[in-house]
């Protein structure tokens, strides 16, 4: 793929989205591309930077709106974005960056714990050159898991947590519980 484009990595909690994002960004770094990663600043589960659930860390800019980093990223040709579902300006930002010739890689939850589209992240699908939906392992029956199930009774959409608050589950286990 030459020129600007968007790569979208979606899936449930614990499916390896952040790990795949880091792998792709590192691949471009090895090829001497100038890369930057961005994470949602309200996600501070493990500390600063981009973290995977298995505690791998990667340096990242931290913001709540992507438009806040426009000036800081002008010299970068590859932009990795983790937790893309939380950014209200994700669609406009990615389209603008790709149109300016940048490679944009986004990792995001595709659905909420209620199995509804997560904010406007699915609007990136028709704008993306590459879309990958990862699965996790069902934490109840150990089959392929495509959904995230919240363990608590909270009803708000944006509650940031890991396997202490969410489980990846298959369709049957989601419905049965």
From Swiss-Prot:
It catalyses: thymidine + ATP = dTMP + ADP + H(+). GO terms for biological process: DNA biosynthetic process; thymidine metabolic process. InterPro entries: P-loop_NTPase (IPR027417), Thymidine_kinase (IPR001267), Thymidine_kinase_CS (IPR020633). The active site is at 83 (proton acceptor). Zn(2+) binds at residues 138, 141, 170, 173. Keywords: ATP-binding, Disulfide bond, DNA synthesis, Kinase, Metal-binding, Nucleotide-binding, Transferase, Zinc. One of its GO terms (molecular function) is ATP binding. Substrate binds at residues 113, 157-161. The keyword Disulfide bond applies. ATP binds at residues 11-18. Its EC number is 2.7.1.21. Pfam families: TK. It is an enzyme of class 2 (transferase). Belongs to the thymidine kinase family. Phosphorylates thymidine and thymidine analogs, such as azidothymidine (AZT). Part of the salvage pathway for pyrimidine deoxyribonucleotide synthesis. Homotetramer. Two molecules of substrate bind to each enzyme tetramer. This is Thymidine kinase.
């Amino acid at each position: 793929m030459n020129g600007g484009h968007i790569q979208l990595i979606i899936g449930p909690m614990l499916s390896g989205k952040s790990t795949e994002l880091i792998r792709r960004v590192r691949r471009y770094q090895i090829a001497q591309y100038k890369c930057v990663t961005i994470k949602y600043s309200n996600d501070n589960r493990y500390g600063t930077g981009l973290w995977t659930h298995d505690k791998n860390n990667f340096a990242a800019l931290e913001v709540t709106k992507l438009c806040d980093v426009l000036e800081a990223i002008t010299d970068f040709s590859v932009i990795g974005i983790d937790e893309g579902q939380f950014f209200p300006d994700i669609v406009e930002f990615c389209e603008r960056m790709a149109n300016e010739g940048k490679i944009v890689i986004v990792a995001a939850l595709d659905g909420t714990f209620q199995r509804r589209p997560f904010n406007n992240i699915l609007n990136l699908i028709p704008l993306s050159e590459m879309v990958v939906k990862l699965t996790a392992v069902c934490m109840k029956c150990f089959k392929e898991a495509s959904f995230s199930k919240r363990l608590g009774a909270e009803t708000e959409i944006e509650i940031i947590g890991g396997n202490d608050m969410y489980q990846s589950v298959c369709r049957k286990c989601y419905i049965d519980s």
